[in-house]
A protein has these predicted regions:
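Predominantly extracellular/luminal cell-surface or secreted proteins
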Residues: 14, 32, 46-50, 94, ...
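Pro/Thr/Ser/Gly-rich low-complexity, intrinsically disordered linker/stalk tracts
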Residues: 2-35, 107-114
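Recognizes extended acidic, P/S/T-rich segments that occur
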Residues: 31, 38-86, 92, 96-102, ...
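Extracellular acidic, Ser/Thr/Pro-rich low-complexity tracts
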Residues: 31-37, 95, 143-145, 156-158
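Structural beta-strand segments of beta-rich domains
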Residues: 23-27, 137, 148-150
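Low-complexity, Pro/Ser/Thr- and charge-rich linker/hinge segments at domain boundaries
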Residues: 109-132
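Short beta-strands within extracellular/lumenal beta-sheet-rich domains
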Residues: 131-143
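Aromatic-lined ligand-binding clefts that engage carbohydrates, nucleic acids, or primary amines
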Residues: 141-144, 148-166
Length: 171
């Protein structure tokens, strides 16, 4: 077992967040080290679009390099985050004895990052907001490729249920 390990990784104060719209998110961690006088003397942050690359120290999106610092909150300095993209990140730290320790891989996913990236269309019933009966909306579509993952963004003032292929999604 490692004596020192970076844990509790957060991006903008959230664990593995989805839909962040901050081009410069804050990445933070805690140092798990019970030894007396324990401290971090340096850190390195790796950010990648591939978890294996991040795990193998390949930060093709960002590699901070080794920074001599006890800082545990770092603002992502680059301007290269793309909308609707999942990023994987980890942090390496060096302890008071110069030993390197590595965090587990965490992730964050960007949102629209600006209204110019919005491609959806609102679905509504064009009735007065005070119209009482609850409308049902149905959208039928076929995909051209096999779906690897998908996300539905739903905005309602009250209750909703989402079904895909006849199966209820969520609670």
């Amino acid at each position: 077992q490692e004596e020192c390990k970076p844990v509790n990784l957060h991006c903008d104060h959230l664990i593995n967040p989805l839909g962040i719209d901050n081009a410069n998110p804050r990445l933070s961690w805690m140092l798990d080290d019970a030894r007396q006088g324990a401290r971090q003397t340096a850190y390195q942050i790796i950010v990648s679009t591939d978890s294996l690359k991040a795990n193998n120290e390949n930060g093709e999106i960002w590699n901070s390099g080794k920074k001599e610092s006890d800082q545990i909150l770092v603002t992502y300095p680059e301007k290269n985050l793309q909308p609707f993209t999942k990023y994987y990140w980890k942090v390496n730290v060096w302890d008071k004895d110069g030993k390197k320790a590595t965090s587990d891989i965490n992730s964050f996913e960007t949102g629209m990052m600006g209204m110019e990236n919005w491609q959806g269309a609102w679905i509504g019933d064009n009735r007065d907001i005070n119209y009482k009966p609850a409308p049902y909306f149905r959208k039928t579509f076929d995909t051209q490729k096999k779906v690897k993952s998908a996300r539905a963004y739903i905005t309602v003032a009250g209750l909703y249920e989402l079904y895909i292929n006849g199966e209820k999604i969520g609670n």
